[in-house]
Swiss-Prot record:
Cell location: Cell membrane
Bridged cysteine pairs (disulfide): none
Bias-annotated ranges (Polar residues): 738-748, 792-805
Organism: Anopheles gambiae (African malaria mosquito)
Biological role stated in the UniProt entry: Acts in a planar cell polarity (PCP) complex; polarization along the apical/basal axis of epithelial cells. PCP signaling in the wing disk requires the receptor fz and the cytoplasmic proteins dsh and pk. These act in a feedback loop leading to activation of the jnk cascade and subsequent polarized arrangement of hairs and bristles. Dgo and pk compete with one another for dsh binding, thereby modulating fz dsh activity and ensuring tight control over fz PCP signaling. Vang, stan and pk function together to regulate the establishment of tissue polarity in the adult eye.
Membrane topology of this protein: Peripheral membrane protein
Residue ranges of the region described as Disordered: 1-196, 571-668, 703-867
Biological processes annotated in GO: anterior/posterior axis specification; establishment of planar polarity; establishment of tissue polarity
Biased composition (Gly residues): 122-134, 709-718
Compositional bias ranges of the Low complexity kind: 11-34, 59-73, 106-118, 152-169, 184-196, 853-865
Residues covered by the LIM zinc-binding domain: 382-446, 447-507, 508-570
Protein known as: Protein prickle
Amino acid sequence: MSYPYQKSHHQTQQPQQNGHPQHQLMLQQQQQADHSPHHHHHHHVHHATAHAYPYELGRSPLRSPQSPPLYSGKPPPPPPQSYHSYQQPPTAAHPPVSLSGAPTSMPGMMPGQQPPGMTLSLGGGGGGGGGGSAGDCFMLPPLQPQSPDGLSTVTNTSSTATNAPSARSVYPQHHQPSYPSIGSSHHPFHSPASAAALIGPSMPQHAQQQQQHQMQPHHYSSMHLLGPAGGPPSSVGPASMVGMMGPGGHGGGGVGGGAGGIAGGVGGGPGGGMGGGHNYSQSDDDSGCALEEYTWVPPGLRPDQVHLYFSAIPEDKVPYVNSIGERHRVRQLLQQLPPHDNEVRYCHSLTDEERKELKLFSAQRKREALGRGTVKQITTTLICERCGECASSGDMMVFASRFEPNTCWHPACFACCVCKELLVDLIYFHRENRLYCGRHHAETLKPRCSACDEIILADECTEAEGRAWHIKHFACFECDKQLGGQRYIMRDGKPYCLHCFDAMFAEYCDYCSEPIGVDQGQMSHDGQHWHATDQCFACSTCRCSLLGRPFLPRRGEIYCSIACSKGEPPTPSDEYAHRSSQPSHTAARSPEPLRSPERGTGRLSPPHTEHEVQSHEAASTVGSDRDHQLRSPASNGTATDNGTGTAGGGVGDSNRHRIPHRQPLDLTDLGHSLEQHWQSERTGSETISITTATATVRTQVTGPIAGANGNGPTGGGPILTSSMPELNRCLAAAGSGESPSFSGTNSPTPMPIEDSVVANGGDDADEQNQNASDASHSIKEVRFEGDFQDSLPRTKSYCQRNGGQRNRAAKSSSYASDDDELAEDETDNYHHRRHHHSHQREQQRPVDDSDARSVCSTCSSSSSSADDDVYELPLRRTSYGGTRIHYMPNNSLACARKRKQLQTSSGVAGQHYEKDNKNCIIS
């Protein structure tokens, strides 16, 4: 007959129990009195092991007067004396006992979940196995049950330190070997409130077994790892493992303690007495028992040795009650000792043949490899088997009977050689002189399925990525399609078919936004992905393919060059520099070329008939000649003169090229257009002589240069050029005696204009000689914006490096009145302008890297052309190799105003002004 547990807390038993048989009283007394440590060595096999979950021991299970007795309404008499401190520790001199039973751990148990009542099956052995039955079972209580009276619950099933007699101690327990275990009530009671509540009347053995198998199908303990008698003394199974679910889903007695399992230090060992919710708590009698602090302790140690042992283990792995270490221990029990490695009932879909093989496999492992470490305090110096360091006398070391006698480990070194985790509860497997946990030892013998985590007992399996699967389990993780012989992709250790992988993990192309399939090439950079095609993996600006080429990632885009990364095509300067580096020069079209506007005379050819006349340097014949590019609007390739005649043979026909229509640049620098000159930067400098008054500006071409350009030494024909379209408007009112101005290209291409020629169609030789006798003065520009004197509209002159690099025109400023005055002054006073360039001297002069200005900032005067034939600018070399570009205000009307003032001034003052200016040197 069975009696349900009552919710009472700590209870004692009386000899008379309201009609219950006397043998039940004796059973209760026997089972409660088995807690006394001086009886442990008689019944060490049957002691309950340490629990994996906290139990409060704030009160003694036998000293609670508030709790009524279990079977009687009589108040219990007070105990005759208080408890004494923990006395004689258990010894290791016990005969070997073989234990067998249920598995050790419960699959799927969460760390915070109360484990079920733990049922331990103990095989009949030297300690008395329950009257020769197949095995006696006992179940541990659940975690921390709460008593109705609000007092702390007490569960002390293994070792309460006391030697005092009590009302229950009428019959010595060592005279009753027929009662096999502590608290072996065999009833699947739900929530026992105290140690006394665990005691119940006995049941027939067959009823116990039947009820156990029917109502507790999942009970599991470490006893299943320890086979029947036949193993070595230390291979007796640990009595403390995970109990499984009891009836009603209530948690059982947690993960086992250290007492009663392995032979040698099992009997009477402190089996993990449960303390309060804090560490280092003390019981009511201030015994200082170390068992109250831990959920598991090594068997056979004194309290001081227990502290010494755990001090050698990392703090986060010490199984304090209600600590991280306790939860870690529970997890490691399930990890290191999988129940499906030993018990058929925890496996799925096994055939009869596989069931038999699993039983043989489990029994062989237990017989040949299973063992449990023994903790001892050494008295001599030994060397740790794992770390090789010496352990001095007094240190706690772990020994294993399956190894050599003096083989030992530090407590923190007693770990699995594969996973490097501490062997939970010191349970190890031996193979080839190495320590293994249960999981990895089984994997050394048979493969483990990566899907179901069970040992593969079949003859065939699927292996992929260095892992194994049951054939039916190797399937897509998403759609469960079997992948045997199919293509698959592993992701996070799980196989996927191609379709599911594309749907779940495919990247999207940054260019076309389409998914990149597993069969398509993929380019990736910094979290971005592209199809590995010329269309997708290309420069974001020019769309040139970047496959096999270095690329420039910028702002989430990829580019082929720095220019493209700035969002613009190569600049004209870059194009110019690139082309000028080539040995032969070709005519390059300017992005913004000039086009000479129509003159006021109306006798110019329309703009659509303009031609580009280029003088090319013959690299093989003319070594240092300059390149010339002249563009003049002409009809049928000839220049039209206004009134003095036409000369169309001034330009060689061989260097004349027709170009398409171009729009003029918006250039407004008019005032300095005839006097602003640039000197050569690299290969030579040009001497610029500017004469004013009645002198005309002419390009003197001699020697091979004239031959190259088609201009004879005497000037085959006057060619009027101007780099500024605004200059043509200034010269429009000059009358019929002035030649029209042809537009010279202000081109950033490799053929910039070097000479701006304004020629008169009359006598060329006289005008050349007239340069020395002109009474006008030449004004040279400087960077300053002061009151410099201008007497001419100025034209731009570009000096070109031998490398062909472009010089940008500098802009100067002058302040003027209006366009009409400028036109009138030009008509009255200036018919001709000449731009003099001495090419022979430039070949003999070093490179000038600076800007040549034509305005003196010191005296603001011009030199007289009557004194000098050519006013030559001295060279100046700077420390750097680049061109200095100065930008100035470009109001050209100021030039006309200042020129008018000079005309009205006295001739003497003008001559003095011109003479003062001739000695000014621009540097």
